[in-house]
Every structure is written in structure tokens, then in C-alpha cells.
Amino acid sequence: MQRITLEQVFKHHITQKYVNRSGMVHAIAVAYHAFHLAKKHHASVDAATKAGFLHDIGHHTWYTGGEWDYDLYKKNDIHAIKGAERSHKLLIRLGEHPKLAKEISVAILLHTDSFLLEQTLERTPLQNVIKWADEADEEPGGAHHYRTISYEKALKAIQQLDRLVERELQIEQKKLNDKAEHSYQ
């Protein structure tokens, strides 16, 4: 199965519709944070960047008078639930491996405590990475959802992140190959 790239995810019309709604700059920033945190905490950089990029794909438009209503959002939000479902469907349609699509979607589901009644969860390294990456880019009052970027600039940032992920995956594969080679000697 061929790896689905962030560029493929980025270019899909569903991604454009829903990630633009919740903030493309924020999505890209969280994906970059997730990449670096995944390396540090031994999580999959491929899964982390995809989950980081798609983590807010479930946002509803909580607007009042044309402005994002942060209080209304905090009171009624279930974007992590909707985002987990939406991202899973998108990734499967793009041809992502079902196990990886599920892992990414569950990380999206658990990236926030906003809908949880009890906050004592045991998260996996990937789930922690996405939560921390999102928190690293948050701004007071939800201002991180307002930043804008051109399609071209966003695409370049995504392509650069794809190159970083690909390079890291090659390094990981080489380590596995070297380890396997040494075990046969």
C-alpha cells in the first residue's frame, strides 16, 4: 500500500472546505508541531502530521454576527467527535491503510478534553502528541482560528512537511534494515 501524503489530504475538497473553516494556518502549524513532538516522543511522524493537520476538521461554524463566538463554541462543541468521523472517512477514501486511518482518527477524537466528562484518560504517545501540538499553537479566545494564508503558500508548507516526513520515514526504515542485518550476522 502506497503512503498517502499530506499533499493528497490537503488538496481534497473535503479538507479544503472544513480545514479552511477552522483555520488552515492553525492546521499547518499543529502538523509541524506534531512532527517534531512525534520524533521526540517516539510516535509515528506520518500519523502525527496527518492527525495534527486534520485535528479541527470537525469544527462547526460557531459564529455570532459574522465573528467566531468562542463562548458558544466552548459551551456546545463536539468538534473532536465529528472530526474523528470526518477524518476517518476522508483518509479511507484517499486509500489510507484502515489501521492507520483509525489510529489518526482516535488521536483526533482525544486531542481535546472539551467534550469529556472525566479527564483521567490514558493516552498513547500519538494521542498526547496531537493534544500537545494543538495546545502549542492555541491563542486566547480562539484567535488561532482567524489567521489566514494563501492556497499557494499553504501548499508549499504542506509539501515541505511531506519532504520532512518522507526523510524521517527513510531514516527509520534504514535503522530497521540495519538492525535486521545485524541480527542475521
PLM segments and residue spans:
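Divalent metal-dependent phosphate-bond-processing catalytic cores, especially two-metal-ion Mg2+/Mn2+ enzymes
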Residues: M1-R3, Y18-S44, L54, E96, ...
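Active-site flanking loop/helix segments enriched in acidic
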Residues: I4-A29, T64-D71
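A generic structural signal for nonpolar/aromatic side chains embedded in well-ordered alpha-helices
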Residues: V9-H13, I108, I130
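Short, well-structured alpha-helical segments
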Residues: M24, I28-A31, T49-K50, A101-L109
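An active-site-proximal "capping" alpha-helix that borders the catalytic cofactor pocket
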Residues: V30, L37, D77-R93
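His-Asp-centered metal-binding catalytic motifs of divalent-metal-dependent phosphohydrolases/nucleases
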Residues: D46-W68, G83, S105-D113
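A charged helix-plus-loop insertion that forms the helical arch/lid used to bind
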Residues: E67-D77, E122
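Internal catalytic-core helix/loop-beta-alpha segment
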Residues: R86-I104, L110, S114
